[in-house]
């Protein structure tokens, strides 16, 4: 990776001149500008955290990159991040990637050029080599709720696998005899661990079949489509564990459109604990994550890394809690 000193050497000027050119601070004559521009192009140099470190300054800005601004889970995370950042004198740049890897990479490139002090990632698409590249450029980062496989970085998340097992056990406890799972993207730790938790809970049971799982992509429309496909394959499904509340909302809508009563014909449980599960009828049982607390802790952790208070990578996993509501409150057989 080219450094500011490499650019200065190739252009035949001082590092201070390169710094003035990059920061548009002070006079640089036109001939020198052309030389610097050519050197930057030749070396494919990007002004980034290295230049920021040489300049010896911070911007008081952090970024949060997340995949879906329409998902209330990420809205609550963003609220917590902004609240804590403001307490410490930082401004937050919110970057919605729409779950598009190329858009995410564009954000990362722009954020490096604008000298943000650190980045919070709630990303589906970040790879372990992306993490290593950012670490090599001395950009503090924290992964929030998800992390790439084999990546060495700080993570704030919750106990997804344990929560999935709680959800399935609850559905069995209310009398479900055939439970399906609508799962999220398997490139995410959230989608992957919740699917594993489901499978570990039911794969030993006589009714289990791999065809009882269906992708829902963490979206409302994904939940609706998954229910349609699952019920076509297995009309006797009487319990559904959706891997997040957004998919659970879609599942509820589709079940009701199909004329199936929730919970008496099909009991339904989601995961996350977003407020939208309270405004539908019936209210949706969910495995609740402490979303706001996760956002607060991840921001404090990032700021401590920025300010040099901690050097080592840390992992924090929050407990989850089952909240039972109308979507699993079945009538007792003796009533």
Residue ranges, per PLM feature:
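Short acidic/polar active-site loop segments enriched in Thr and Asp
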Residues: 14, 60, 117, 177-178, ...
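Short hydrophobic/charged patches on amphipathic alpha-helices used for structural packing
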Residues: 51, 105-108, 131, 168, ...
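Active-site-adjacent beta->alpha loops and helix N-cap segments on the catalytic face
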Residues: 127-135
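Short beta->alpha connector loops
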Residues: 100-101, 122-127, 246
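Amphipathic helical "hinge" segments at domain boundaries
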Residues: 30, 45-117, 196-199
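N-terminal helix-turn-helix DNA-binding module of bacterial transcription factors
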Residues: 1-60, 329-332
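Bacterial carbohydrate/catabolite-sensing allosteric modules
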Residues: 1, 42, 80-88, 136-143, ...
């Amino acid at each position: 990776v080219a450094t500011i000193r490499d650019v200065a050497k190739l252009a035949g000027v001082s590092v201070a001149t390169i710094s003035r050119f990059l920061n548009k601070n002070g006079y640089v004559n036109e001939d020198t500008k052309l030389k610097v521009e050519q050197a930057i192009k030749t070396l494919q140099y990007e002004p980034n955290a290295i230049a920021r470190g040489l300049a010896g300054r911070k911007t008081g800005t952090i970024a949060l990159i997340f995949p879906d601004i329409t998902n209330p889970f990420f809205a609550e995370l963003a609220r917590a991040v902004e609240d804590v950042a403001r307490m410490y004198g930082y401004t937050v740049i919110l970057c919605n990637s729409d779950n598009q890897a190329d858009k995410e990479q564009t954000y990362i490139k722009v954020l490096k050029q604008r000298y943000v002090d650190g980045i919070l990632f709630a990303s589906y698409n970040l790879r372990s080599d992306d993490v290593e590249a950012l670490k090599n450029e001395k950009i503090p980062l924290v992964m929030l709720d998800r992390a790439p496989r084999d990546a060495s970085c700080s993570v704030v998340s919750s106990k997804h696998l344990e929560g999935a097992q709680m959800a399935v056990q609850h559905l069995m406890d209310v009398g479900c005899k055939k439970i399906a799972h609508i799962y999220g993207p398997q490139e995410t730790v959230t989608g992957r661990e919740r699917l594993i938790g489901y499978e570990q809970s039911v794969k030993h049971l006589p009714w289990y079949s791999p065809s009882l799982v269906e992708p829902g992509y963490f979206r409302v429309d994904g939940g609706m489509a998954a229910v349609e496909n699952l019920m076509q394959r297995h009309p006797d499904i009487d319990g559904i564990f959706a891997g997040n509340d957004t998919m659970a909302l879609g599942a509820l809508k589709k079940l009701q459109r199909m004329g199936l009563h929730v919970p008496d014909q099909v009991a339904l449980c989601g995961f996350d604990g977003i407020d939208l599960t309270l405004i539908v009828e019936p209210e949706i049982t969910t495995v609740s994550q402490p979303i706001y607390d996760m956002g607060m802790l991840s921001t404090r952790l990032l700021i401590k890394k920025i300010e040099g208070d901690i050097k080592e990578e840390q992992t924090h996993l929050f407990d989850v809690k089952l909240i039972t509501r109308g979507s699993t409150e079945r009538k007792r057989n003796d009533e």
